[in-house]
Amino acid sequence: EAQIRSLDSERYTMLPCHSASQIYQEAGITELPMLLGFNLYNGWYGGNLGGFEEKLEELHKEFPHKPLLITEYGADVDTRIHSFSPVRFDFSCEFGSVYHEHYLPEILKRNYIVGAMVWNLNDFYSEARRNAMPHVNNKGLVSTDRERKDGYYLYQAYLKESPVLHIASKSWKNRAGASRDGKSCTQPLKVYTNADKVEVFLNGKSLGVYPVADKVVSVDIPFVNGKNVVDAVIEKEGREYRDQYVCDFKCVNVKNGFTEINVLLGARRYFEDRIAEMCWIPEQAYAEGSWGYIGGEVAPNKTRYGSLPASDTDILGTDQDPVFQTQRVGIEAFKADVPDGVYAVYLYWTELTSENKREALVYNLGNDVVREDYINRVFSVDINGVSVAKQLNIAEEYGSE
């Protein structure tokens, strides 16, 4: 520090730290730099989102005389994954949005936080990573092919003075959902804007005018089967601004207009296969006249900080890893009360347990899935009482990680 001051008295110096500030204090180095930075990931690698502002207050009490910066924060987002009950490490667009919607206002309201750096602007390659998109760190506000994620527009709504209006999840072109009547399915859709209110239209019909709080509003959209056009309209500075979202929606109902169903067992998330232009939807328990699983339980993905919503296994031979990373183990049957007819049934399997040990990734901060005791899993499959597979052993026939 003294050397830097002698060479350039105007240059600021900073020490970036992780959240365990006491380690740096005990080493006697927190008083050396002019600024202190902290990498904080409350609610992503562990804990909950509310722990972020608690940590900020704690750090301010520890270092009241130091300007503080958040030198890293972020959550991984795979733009193909969605969830209406988002949780940490599900890699959904919706959890990423919730994360930044929580962090950014907490940063802006505190004058002692003099700067913050999102980790990262762009997704980037990281060879040892697995999870939803192996070999990629997905914490960017922009994907590797420069697709802007929803969080990008949240920052614009907060930081730009010119009008901002953006319908979230615009890249989700192929949507689907369970429908009671086969004609419509209601799902929430967010709009980011720095206007006070926004009017939302579906296929030319107004759904109402909605007040905006903290630069975002969530609107329940009654999507119909087929093409949907959602328009958002604001007035700002005497001018009208519009944004539009177009998607194809498949209302899944086994009685009315049934054509297909693509289900992720063991999942609460949706996955868009953009190549096949199809959408996988979360599982549900079977009920008469409908569809769903019978028996079993969600495959555990245990870590030091609780269970994760999906395995972190790299599925070889595909880039559609999220299709294979959730399971319902011990399932007795899957039943769909579809009309009489001829159907094609595709069953996708993978073995997520393994005898092989693997090295934990240090930057996952304890969130690597703990290997369960290996089970030599063998099973058979019948469809409508007809045997289609006997004594399947996925690990033996195709291998495991």
Where are these regions (language model features)?
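Short, solvent-exposed loop/turn segments in extracellular or other extracytoplasmic domains
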Residues: 212-216, 329-331
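Extended substrate-binding grooves/exosites of carbohydrate-active enzymes
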Residues: 1-209, 222-223, 236-237
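Edge beta-strands of extracellular beta-sandwich domains
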Residues: 238-252
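Compositionally biased, intrinsically disordered or flexible polar/acidic segments
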Residues: 251-401
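Exposed aromatic-hydrophobic patches
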Residues: 216-223, 334, 401
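Exposed beta-strand face motif in extracellular beta-rich ectodomains
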Residues: 226-230, 343
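Beta-strand-rich extracellular modules
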Residues: 233-237, 350
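Solvent-exposed serine/threonine-rich low-complexity stretches and specific carbohydrate-binding patches
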Residues: 203-214, 389-397
